[in-house]
Regions:
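Short, non-transmembrane cytosolic segments of multipass membrane proteins
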Residues: 1-17
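Cytosolic juxtamembrane amphipathic/interface segments immediately preceding
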Residues: 20-43
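Alpha-helical transmembrane segments of multipass membrane proteins
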Residues: 49-57, 61, 113, 117, ...
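Outer-pore turret/helix-boundary of cation channels
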Residues: 52-80
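Pore domain of cation channels
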Residues: 69-134
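Canonical alpha-helical transmembrane segment with a positive-inside/aromatic-interface signature
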Residues: 120-185
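Extended, solvent-exposed segments with strong compositional bias
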Residues: 185-226, 239-245
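Acidic, serine/threonine- and proline-rich intrinsically disordered appendage/tail regions
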Residues: 242-290
């Protein structure tokens, strides 16, 4: 019976989900593992592979005592450093294989070493070239009257100094509901936004959903949302103007992240010189309505 995993995932909102019973296939999905592991663990992993690889071939060279000429330092560590030089194709000219067995081992090491280094280089390039979105989301969402109707408002900002072209936003409500048969299921509702597209997303973006009688949030309160295990998922996507790559970001909001009868602090001001200024130090600030 294959071994299974038990792993806890922490969502952007802080919500934790623990998964059990999935087959353990970490070694069959190394590409995804190395794309998602932290940089320190990645370098430690590559360093450990490099050390173990050369230890293995040093042990193979040790099977024949006179396989390497001018071995220095003598013994196992001399063979280890010869393996390092062979893997890197340095060719200092002092130590070299002098028997058929040593030549065969060195040839096999060069072949496997080139393949391994090519894979490592490709993985590093994939990590560096992977598009990342530097999108700042407000810590809280607010609900306030706007144009006579309660409106859910969220705020996002582009942390980079370049433009995200054709930015699109989608807001969804996830909550537990009961069917007419009494079966409890989790449903996802789309929450229409007043403006879900931005042709050029450079500074900030306030996203608004009007809680009309037809809205899935109509009549909702903090208590009902908690009872239904509800949360909001906001996703943003667009094209980086500099690289032409598609960017994606998401944020989740739990019921305790919603602030009723509050509004976002104004971060835009105009100085006496006529220049408009955006103060991102107040980006997360909210204010109660009078």
């Amino acid at each position: 019976m294959p071994s299974t995993t038990s792993k806890t995932h922490t969502q952007p909102s802080g919500r934790q989900i623990q998964r059990h019973g999935l087959p353990r296939r970490r070694w069959q999905d190394l590409y995804h593992v190395y794309m998602t592991v932290s940089w320190p663990r990645l370098f430690v992993s590559f360093g450990g592979f490099f050390f173990a690889f050369n230890l293995l071939f040093a042990a193979l060279y040790s099977l024949q005592a006179n396989g390497i000429a001018q071995l220095n330092p003598p013994g196992f560590w001399g063979r280890f450093f010869f393996s390092v030089e062979t893997l890197a194709t340095v060719g200092y000219g002092d130590m070299h294989p002098q028997t058929l067995f040593a030549h065969i081992v060195a040839s096999f090491e060069i072949f496997t070493g080139m393949m391994s280094l090519a894979l490592i280089a490709g993985m590093m390039f994939a990590r560096f070239s992977r598009p990342t979105a530097r999108i700042l989301f407000a810590r809280h969402a607010v609900i306030r009257p706007l144009d006579g109707r309660p409106t859910l408002m969220l705020r996002a900002a582009n942390e980079r100094h370049n433009v995200i072209m054709e930015a699109q936003a989608h807001l969804r409500l996830v909550r537990d509901e009961r069917t007419i048969e009494g079966y409890r299921i989790r449903r996802i509702h789309d929450l229409p936004l007043r403006r879900s597209e931005q042709p050029a997303f450079l500074y900030g973006w306030t996203l608004m959903h009007t809680m009309t009688p037809d809205s899935p949030l109509a009549g909702a309160t903090s208590e009902t949302l908690r009872t239904d295990n509800a949360f909001l998922i906001l996703t943003l996507s667009g094209v980086d103007e500099t690289t032409g790559q598609t960017l994606m970001a998401r944020q989740e909001y739990l019921p305790e992240d919603l602030r009723w009868q509050h509004t976002f602090a104004d971060i835009l001001s105009r100085g006496e010189d006529g220049i408009e200024r955006i103060d991102y130090r107040r980006f997360h600030d909210i204010e109660p309505l009078n």
